Structures are given as structure tokens and as C-alpha cells.
């Protein structure tokens, strides 16, 4: 099966939001998509920009034929001031379907207060399964020891999952 790649850009004017997306896969196989949501920097407060991003996210997932039926594997939020923005984001995320979420204290280059990167897939593959984890770390010892401890922890988690 040959893999198809498609790159698109979609503007949602009333939300002042742009979505760039890349689609991978083809007929009869697992499809993948990477979506990057940007909001205009002058589109209001952080809360207003967060609302616009979330509305754009739901609109794209429900209306774009090639994305319909795909499920999010992870969402990565880029925030301009994570310490002060996390609480509002957390309140929104509690109302959303579950997927791995990461938050990066890195202001979007365009000057907005928030951007969102989403990875989606159409169906699980019977040959393998993705496991996503976040926040793991070992704070004591030298870097080699930290790495070994962390890898042993991952190994134990995988053994526990069968």
C-alpha cells in the first residue's frame, strides 16, 4: 500500500483561527493526522483565545471528512504564561474526552497566548499499541542512573500491561 500525504491550511474567520494539518495514510490502512491550531494574536484575552482554539478543534473534528472518525492520541498546548494560564486550561480539559495532554511554556511565535498541536489516528493497529506517558522523571543521582531507573520503570509498566 502506498502512503498518501496531504497538507492543508484552513481558516475559520469568525473564530480568527487558522488550522494547518497534515494527513497520512490511504485506503484500507490506518490514517494519521497532525493538526496545528493558531489564533490571531489580537483575538482577545487568553480565555477568549482558548475558547476560539477549542471551538476550532471541535469544528474541524466534526466537519472535515478526511478527519472525521479519527481520535486524538495527544494534544500539546503551547502557552505564553503557563503558570497563570494552566488553571483555565485545566477547567476546559476536564470537560473533554480523554487523551494524553502536555503543556509547554513556550509562547507561540505569532504573538498569541496559546497554540495547539493535536495528533490523531483513525484506528488502532492490531500489531502494536501506543502507550503515552508524561511527567516521568528521576530527581536523584547522575544522569546515567536517572536514565536507567526511568527505563526500568517503563519496562515494569509494559510488563504489567502484558
Set out the residue ranges of the language-model regions:
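Short, polar/acidic, helix-capping and beta-turn segments at strand->helix junctions
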Residues: 1-162
